[in-house]
From Swiss-Prot:
The lineage of its organism: Bacteria, Pseudomonadati, Pseudomonadota, Gammaproteobacteria, Pseudomonadales. The keyword Transport does not apply. It comes from Pseudomonas fluorescens (strain ATCC BAA-477 / NRRL B-23932 / Pf-5). The keyword Signal applies. This is Tol-Pal system protein TolB. Pfam families: PD40, TolB_N.
Length: 433
């Protein structure tokens, strides 16, 4: 249904033409700063068989994906220390590394014990040391944990590498035979598991703030209806059954309310449901389409997409009353709003001019400037990491729907590994630890 509404908005936008941008706003298309060089040395392994996952590779990829760090390739490393006493700082200074991480993995009673240490190369001082244990199957979990600890120590920002991702795949076997699958994976696309399969479309999956429930739109009754599902048990509950469109669910920050879009009274508008009483209240009204709600962290403000001004733009409104305030002014299409954790940045799907080139962009909410983050052309469904450092979005490559990751500073752009078929509708989890 989100794609249907987006299509409606695109048509309206094309008919409306291109409006002039507010002169006080600025469009930025690229940056010039560089990521900090870091060396994550392959961890020593004192066991017999080969481990299924390379911890150093996973940690390096995590730090790279943040856009803050540039890992030094293994083939460029002069030495391969596995413990603090083996670190020769002149080797890493010669390579231009500002930080170096070493570690070792030791089998212990059927489990693995991992020791790691992080050093500042310039000062030759230890920045972080620690240990973590787990099973062989938890190698990726332990790697993401070390990434989280290291990133927070170096930047002061909580790491988001132990989070999860929801997305939908569509695998078409024939004209009337498509299988839709709701998947959950690590944030980087690894270890995907199936939560739901259907012969009808699944749209707009969203994690609840507790990370234990999800809401999504299913067409299994041949019309869009919103369901809530418990991840651990698979128990599902249908929560809407209104005439017309039922879609775009969005959890409130405390998980007690759910915003969504209904067209039961005419045009699509945003409503809020109290999850305890199941009572609903209307947030938007008037002509035009109002869709894609996203909550501010105060639990009272909702950002949303509306074409009330003649073309799709982002607005915000208080659920307790009052008019809507326009937020975006650059470009003739701005939709799918998401806020960074500090609420200083608005991430959205943006089109500067013309009728193509839908790209992920970030707007500084204090200055009004907009920075285009991607170089793809048909972007949609952007979702932001809970620490605001990374964005995952859906786009098309070689005629196929894929997921891409881009750092919020624009330094890193890369595809995520996913299953066969069309991949769409990504949604990032909250912190899970």
């Amino acid at each position: 249904m989100r794609n249907l509404l987006r299509g409606m908005l695109v048509v309206i936008c094309c008919m409306a033409g291109i409006a002039a941008a507010d002169e006080k706003n600025i469009l930025v298309t690229s940056g010039s700063d560089r990521a900090t060089p870091i060396a994550v040395v392959p961890f020593g392994w004192q066991g017999g068989s080969v481990l299924p996952d390379d911890m150093a590779q996973i940690i390096g990829d995590d730090l790279r994906n943040s856009g803050y760090y540039a890992p030094i390739p293994k083939q460029n490393m002069i030495s391969l220390p596995t413990q603090a006493s083996e670190v020769i700082f002149r080797d890493w200074k010669a390579l231009g590394a500002q930080y170096v991480m070493v570690g070792s993995i030791v089998p212990a009673g059927g489990r693995l014990q991992v020791q790691y240490a992080l050093f500042n190369v310039a000062t030759e001082q230890q920045v972080l040391t620690g240990s973590v244990s787990g099973s062989v199957d938890q190698l990726r979990d332990m790697s993401h944990y070390i990434s989280d600890q290291s990133f927070e120590k170096l930047t002061g920002i909580k790491g988001a590498f132990s989070t999860r991702l929801l997305y939908v795949t569509a695998e078409r076997f024939s004209v009337n035979n498509t299988r839709y699958t709701l998947q959950r994976s690590d944030y980087d696309g690894a270890r995907a598991v199936t939560l739901l399969q259907s012969r009808e479309p699944i749209l707009s999956p969203r994690f609840a703030p507790d990370g234990k429930r999800i809401a999504y739109v299913s067409f299994e009754q041949k019309r869009p209806r919103i369901f809530v599902q418990h991840i651990d048990t698979g128990r599902r509950e249908q929560i809407t059954n209104f005439e017309g469109l039922n879609g775009a669910p969005a959890w409130s920050p405390d998980g007690t309310r759910l915003a969504f879009v209904l067209s039961k009274d005419g045009n699509p508008d945003i409503y809020v449901m109290n999850m305890a009483s199941r009572q609903i209240s209307r947030v938007t009204s008037g002509p035009g389409i109002n869709t894609e709600p996203f909550w501010g962290k105060d639990g009272s403000t909702i950002y949303f997409t509306s074409d009330r001004g003649g073309k799709p733009q982002v607005y915000k409104s208080n659920i307790n009353g009052g008019g809507a305030e326009r937020v975006t002014f650059i470009g003739n299409y701005n939709a799918n709003p998401k806020l960074s954790a500090d609420e200083k940045t608005l991430v959205m799907i943006h089109r500067q001019d013309g009728f193509t080139n839908f790209r992920v962009a970030a707007q500084d909410l204090q200055r009004g400037s907009v920075k285009i983050l991607t170089d793809t052309n048909l972007d949609e469904s952007a979702t932001v990491a809970p620490n605001g450092t990374m964005v995952i979005y859906a786009t098309r490559q070689q005629g196929r729907g894929v997921l891409m990751l881009v750092s919020i500073n624009g330094r890193v752009r890369l595809p995520l590994p996913t299953a066969q078929g069309e991949v769409r509708e990504p949604s990032w989890s909250p912190y899970l630890n």
